[in-house]
């Protein structure tokens, strides 16, 4: 599997809606598409007001698998970008849950 970044701008009206979407995403990925896609992590974006978007890191067999997962889980997938390499300078910082 290759690594991809998925940009989901203004995907949800509030953090609660994002939590519901995350549950659907996990279910589809783990139960229906486990051979084709693996969710690694997401960064939640403040989009103004209560709205949130995400930058998600996935491993997948193809961009088409990511699009199919997004469709099945009812998620936006504004842009899918293949990751060429990873440079880790420092580990991700720990942040308090919102």
Locate predicted features.
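Amphipathic, hydrophobic secondary-structure cores in small proteins
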Residues: 45-47, 54-58
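An amphipathic, aromatic/His-enriched active-site/gating alpha helix that lines ligand/cofactor pockets
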Residues: 59-89
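Short S/T/G/P-rich N-terminal loop/turn motif that feeds into the first structured element of a domain
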Residues: 1-41, 45, 63, 68, ...
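Generic preference for hydrophobic/aromatic residues in regular secondary structure cores
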Residues: 39, 44, 50, 80-83
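Residues at beta-strand starts and edge strands
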Residues: 2, 52-54
């Amino acid at each position: 599997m290759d690594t991809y970044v998925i940009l989901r701008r203004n995907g949800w009206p509030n953090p609660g809606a994002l939590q519901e979407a995350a549950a659907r995403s996990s279910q589809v990925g783990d139960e229906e598409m486990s051979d084709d896609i693996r969710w690694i992590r997401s960064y939640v974006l403040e989009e103004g007001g209560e709205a949130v978007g995400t930058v998600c890191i996935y491993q997948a067999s193809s961009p088409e698998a990511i699009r199919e997962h997004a469709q099945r889980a009812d998620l936006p997938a504004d842009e899918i970008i293949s990751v060429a390499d990873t440079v880790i300078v420092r580990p991700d910082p720990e942040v308090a849950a919102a």
